[in-house]
Structure formats: structure tokens, C-alpha cells
Amino acid sequence: MEKLDLLYEGKAKRVYKTDDPRYYIIEYKDEATAFDGKKKGIIQGKGTVNNKVSAVFFQLLEENGVPTHFVELLSPTEMLVKRVEIIPLEVIVRNYAAGSISRRLGLEEGIKFDQPIVEFCYKNDELGDPMVNNYHILAMKLANEEEINALTQQALRINQILSQFLLGKNIILVDFKLEFGRTDEGDIVLADEISPDTCRFWDSATMEKLDKDRFRRDMGGVEEAYMEIARRLGCV
């Protein structure tokens, strides 16, 4: 598969066309941002970790009947994916109170919810990815009712699979962000990435943070946390 023109460059990834219009190549970067791009930095080795960790999760989900855009790893920082039309929604699943929901609702960090909470945010950098509900999504024609239900059910299924898998690695899946895309046939598949950039991972024994929060909060040990996740998942 030949890598062609750069199609899109985001905060954490570059997307390239290939000589087969059905596929793209995603390259993961070491650059890191937080707070809507206000904070920037470099996390050495992040691109490699996120690429390999995402591949582990995509393969696990495929094995459990969840369709994804993943095809194969091409290099330490690159993967081949199916071309999809990204739905401009972030689907967030929360098992514990942390981050924005703690600030928004005055919840103490670390409180476990009786059942997972699913939230939607409209993907728009200029607006700061505002939270939206089903009525907003329908009014803006971002997805229809059937698709909203499918996104919700897929997100909860993914949460169930990943949470159980990670507990076996002594990792708590606190919360995470998903993005989905439509195939040419109209099917919805999981896209983007699942990594320490998009998830909150806590050590199940110590509650130590093993994710991007270490960068956001200037906690230090950022590279070590990313590598620890990769190590526990057998990526290094």
C-alpha cells in the first residue's frame, strides 16, 4: 500500500490517502495538546504507544463482534484503516467521576457511577466541542434516531468489553471518548483511536493516573505512564 498525499492533520494524528481509495493511512504523532489546544507539548514515544495500544483494542473489539476501521499495523507509528465518513460527534462513556463531569456537576473525583453515563459532544474546535443531547443531534442532522441508538449501544458494548479486559491488567477504565464513521455501505464502525490520549486509565491498586491527565495537570511521569499502559497490554 503506497502512502500518497496528506489528507488531514489533527492534534495527534495525520491522515494520508493511499493508492487504494478504500483505505487511508493514519500516522500517530508525539505532539500533545490539552484545554482546546491552549497547552501544547511533546510526549516522547506517544505516537508509537497510541498506535500499538489502539491496534490491541481494535483487534479485541473485532474479536468480540464490534466493527472498526482498523485493518493492520504498518509501522511503529502507522496503521492502515478503512476509509469512513466521520460522524461529527464524540461519544463519551463515564464509569467514574473525573475531569469535566466533576467540574460541571460538583462531583468528587473517583466516585463510581451505578451505571455508565453516555454523553455526546459536537466535534467543533472553534466551539470547544460543546455537549449536545439527542434533540440537538437530530435538529442539526448529525445523525438520525436509529444511528443515535446504535452509537449509544455500541459505546456501552465497547465499555463492557474494554473494562473487563483492562481489569485483568490491573487497570480501571475511568472514562473514554469514541468516534465513529459511516462506511460507503452506510454501516457505522468505530474509528479514530483508543489510547491514553482518549481514555482515563487508573491503576486498580494505587489509583495512579496512567494517561494524558499527567500532561494536563503537570504531574510528571507522562512518558512513563504511557509506556506502562503499553507494557501491560504487551505492546513493548
Swiss-Prot record:
Pathway(s) it belongs to: Purine metabolism; IMP biosynthesis via de novo pathway; 5-amino-1-(5-phospho-D-ribosyl)imidazole-4-carboxamide from 5-amino-1-(5-phospho-D-ribosyl)imidazole-4-carboxylate: step 1/2
EC numbers for this chain: 6.3.2.6
InterPro entries: SAICAR_synt/ADE2_N, SAICAR_synt_PurC, SAICAR_synth, SAICAR_synthetase, SAICAR_synthetase_CS
BP GO terms, sorted: 'de novo' IMP biosynthetic process; cobalamin biosynthetic process
Gene Ontology MF annotations: ATP binding; phosphoribosylaminoimidazolesuccinocarboxamide synthase activity
Keywords, ordered alphabetically: ATP-binding, Ligase, Nucleotide-binding, Purine biosynthesis
Enzyme class at the top of the EC tree: ligase
Catalytic activity: 5-amino-1-(5-phospho-D-ribosyl)imidazole-4-carboxylate + L-aspartate + ATP = (2S)-2-[5-amino-1-(5-phospho-beta-D-ribosyl)imidazole-4-carboxamido]succinate + ADP + phosphate + 2 H(+)
Keyword Zinc: no
Keyword set includes Membrane: no
Family assignment from sequence similarity: Belongs to the SAICAR synthetase family.
PANTHER family xrefs: MULTIFUNCTIONAL PROTEIN ADE2 (PTHR43599), SI:DKEY-6E2.2 (PTHR43599:SF3)
Name the UniProt record assigns to this protein: Phosphoribosylaminoimidazole-succinocarboxamide synthase
Species of the source: Coprothermobacter proteolyticus (strain ATCC 35245 / DSM 5265 / OCM 4 / BT)
